[in-house]
Amino acid sequence: TAIMEFSGKELIKGEPDASSFPSGGLRATFEARGYTAWDCTSPAFLKKDATGVTLCIPTAFCSYRGEALDKKTPLLRSMQAIDKEATRIFHLFGHTEVKRVTPSVGPEQEYFLIDRDKYLKRKDLIYTGRTLFGAMPPKGQEMDDHYYGVIRERIGSYMKELNEELWKLGVTAKTQHNEVAPAQHELATIYTKANLAVDHNQIVMETMKKVANRHGMACLLHEKPFQGVNGSGKHNNWSLASDTGINMLDPGVTPHENIQFLLVLACIMKAVDRHADLLRQSAAVPGNDFRLGAQEAPPAIISIFVGEQLEDVIDQLISTGSATHSKTGGTLKTGVTTLPDFDKDATDRNRTSPFAFTGNKFEFRMVGSSDSVSSANVVLNTIVAEAFKEAADELEKAADFDLA
């Protein structure tokens, strides 16, 4: 048995070729020196395939002049930027014990499963990932028999093996279910820090395809593989958590009294309004542009949904300069003696908004199913960090903090 050596020096810095791939014009063809750097915040893992067992080490990839040639480097830079500015916000409100703020991400991965023998007969699916011609099926997604139906045994067997393979790789797969369109399904992982969530989602997409092959199926990650039914997206659930366990996007029971939350909310709304073009561009890949607004949500236009409770608080602040109350959800009475009455949430959940507040996080629903979630989070982190910085600069020099 051959034993290969791998030194600590090689772990910390590697030198792969940095010219033989598209770089958007960052590099001339002859400029070949690049560096990899170990991202020690994302655990290494062992991957077993036909070639044997491979040690996979998450790394950043930069050119000789420092240009980012990957999706990890900009993401880590954006996380560093929002950490710095969000920590300033915490300190302004007396939380001086906070030393670090980390963006948390939980992506929901949608996909289609079809028989592999039928897939191999469709050159359009093989070459483009979607059907280019064909007849509409006699039945599409008009009923709820698929979305709310029992998961078929064959699909359940696939999901079981997929979960097992992902957990072996350290990916915390949690939820799986049918989706709206026939043959469409979804897998969601437990939320974690942004760079780890991005790495995990790449593993999820790769593993989905491998496991599908073993079960005689093909996994389609194209955003719009079939006309007339829903396509596949990747909902990006995003929040900000301190090292002391505080979620900056938790409004609490009385949001109108939570001044820190209202400032954070205002900064996020300002960032999305000012840089809607960047946020839209972060989800712009050909397949996804074909999907957005076609027989499904979200539309291709950026808008924000904050819910009835927060919208009412915002209206109070705009009209009077202060907020005196917050709407409550009240009690839901089922009308059945054997079922309990229970407290409702303060607002309904908007399932179609591209950027919706969902209780203690924002859900960016535009990302395409085949795309990396890195770009969307780079933009989110960066534009919100900019808004935080502007707010912190004003508040730190204000003579009257409460008035400012």
Q: Where do the language-model regions lie?
A:
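Glycine-rich, acidic/polar active-site loops that bind/position phosphate-bearing ligands
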Residues: 1-221, 230-233, 240-404
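Short glycine- and Lys/Arg-enriched binding-loop motifs that mark or flank ligand-binding interfaces
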Residues: 227
